[in-house]
Structures are given as structure tokens and as C-alpha cells.
Amino acid sequence: TGKEIAVRPENGEDRNSKIRLTFRQAVKGATVSLSADGKKFKTHIPAGVHDGQKIRLTGKGKPGRNGGKNGDLYLHITVAEDPKFTLRGRDIIMPLPITVSQAVNGAKVTAKDIDGNEITFKVPAGSSSGAEVRISGKGVVNPHENGDLVGRVEIRVPEHPNLVAKHAAKEFDKACGDFADELARER
């Protein structure tokens, strides 16, 4: 009897792969070269990926058999740390060192963004270390909404202040009245 055995399509297996990106590649997005089963191909990593994220590349896993679909390739993302910048959601966070005078009086402070371009933060008068100032839309670029570039204020003083600076600091404390006592009560 001429019985035919029906051959069922089998989908290909999914594969896993790891990729390490620079911080800038993770923030800006990047086209990367990959290989799977000896085949090389390029794919685009979207802007704003974070460390530990998984990206699915449909059809880039093991080939299907008998007309089955190819499996998927799952890319596990590792992002190298940057010495200056960090990512919080779509916002790029950077330190913003300023002087005591700039913190007290407020100031326009120039810094360099992730691309090395000069940008200006407006630090309001009375800012303390840890305060955050933003430049809207200068974070991770996203089709829906861009993140912000955030400067985290760090008030810095000279490591070896001279006598004039030490005297000025004492005069500043006197001029602030009860502020030092208020701080002492917070500790």
C-alpha cells in the first residue's frame, strides 16, 4: 500500500548570545556585527538599552526543518560602565562639580556631554550637593520622548585651601547666621 508519511514542519530552536556594548553605544544605539551558525549579519541595537536587557532577533536562531520557522536569537546585553556618565531610565546622569560661590549665588556652568559637546547647566542659587539640574531632551533619544541630561551638583572646595580661603569660609559661616546650627541639629 502506498501510504505516505506526513512530514510535519519543525520550528528551529531559539539561541542565546551575549554582546558587550560601550556605554555610548547603549545610549545612542549601534549597528553591530553578529554571527550565528557560521552566518554573519548586522543588526541595530536601539538607543537606551540597559545592562542585563534581552533583545529578541526574530528568525535568527536555528533553522526550521520541513518548512518550519527559524528560531529566534536572544541577545543578552552587557553595558560597560562609563567613568563619568550613568543611565537612569532615559536620563543620562553626570557629575556637575561647582564651587561654593556658584552654589550660593547660582551660576551658568559649562560641561561636556557624552558626545564631547559643550553644554550649559543653569544652577539655581542655594543649590546643595546632590541637587539635580536638567537640560531637557538631551538624554537618550527615543521616538516617543527623549530623556534629559541631568547634572548632579557636587560642591567642591580646594584640597589645600590657603589662609585667605579659610578666612573667607569663616566669614561665610558667620554671614549665614544660624545655618550651621540648623545643620548640626540634622546630624
Name every feature range the model reports, one short phrase each.
Residues 36-187:
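Intrinsically disordered, low-complexity linker/assembly segments
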Residues 1-33, 65, 176-187:
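Post-J-domain flank of DnaJ/Hsp40 co-chaperones
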